[in-house]
């Protein structure tokens, strides 16, 4: 991890594919152990989204029991001792480390998938590092946040969907949401990678058989926001 340029005392947001890494003794648990040990002085964050199962027909997300739709390893991570999960109904995050509860606090009051004041916004505020481990830019949910904060066209719906979260105390919390509505989703995010490389925002590396993509949140937002200012519909086109 050190050779990749990751700051162990900072905040690290990880999107990963265990399959892409190749053979790992102990499978995914070993990888989670490695990440947790390396980031022990800081904060380790993984996605724990539930947008695939929570919606109009099933409007309730239970922070303890609703499974993540972001891969088997993220589900294993959120169940680990010491890991906390945020109370966002569709785009929750799981965090382990220094100030996990503070970082995740208040997500039940955020009305968009990655809205201002929420955990994804805090990644920008603290200039977190984002590691794409064996996955590409289409898995970089932070960019959805930039769309929301910086005026991308067609990012979220005008109307709200009535959703609820059951918190750690078993209480049901009403948290209506403007949901993602882009017809292309995150499929166009890969268009941003060449610019990020050219501007020195993105660093490529290797971990096992997987390509790693490492970047800092603030310069990434600055780059994408500048593109959206010139062309608010840029990420709606392939």
PLM segments and residue spans:
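N-terminal and secondary-structure boundary signal
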Residues: 1-238
């Amino acid at each position: 991890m050190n050779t990749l340029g990751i700051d162990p005392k900072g905040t690290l947001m990880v999107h990963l594919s265990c399959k892409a890494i190749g053979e790992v003794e102990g499978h995914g648990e070993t990888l989670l152990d490695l990440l947790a040990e390396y980031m022990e002085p800081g904060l380790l964050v993984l996605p724990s989204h539930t947008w695939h199962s929570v919606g109009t027909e099933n409007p309730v997300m239970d922070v303890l029991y609703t499974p993540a739709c972001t891969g088997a390893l993220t589900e294993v991570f959120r169940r680990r001792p010491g890991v906390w999960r945020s109370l966002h109904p569709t785009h929750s995050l799981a965090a382990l480390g220094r100030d996990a509860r503070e970082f995740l606090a208040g997500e039940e009051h955020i009305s968009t998938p990655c809205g201002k004041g929420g955990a994804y916004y805090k990644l920008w505020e603290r200039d977190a590092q984002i590691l794409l481990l064996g996955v590409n830019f289409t898995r970089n949910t932070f960019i959805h946040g930039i769309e929301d904060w910086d005026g991308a066209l067609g990012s979220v719906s005008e109307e709200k969907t009535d959703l609820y979260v059951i918190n750690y105390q078993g209480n049901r919390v009403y948290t209506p949401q403007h949901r993602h509505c882009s017809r292309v989703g995150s499929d166009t995010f890969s268009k941003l990678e060449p610019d990020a490389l050219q501007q020195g925002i993105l660093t490529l590396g290797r971990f096992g058989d997987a390509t790693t993509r490492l970047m800092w949140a603030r310069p990434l937002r600055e780059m994408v926001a500048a593109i959206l200012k010139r062309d608010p519909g840029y990420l709606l086109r392939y």
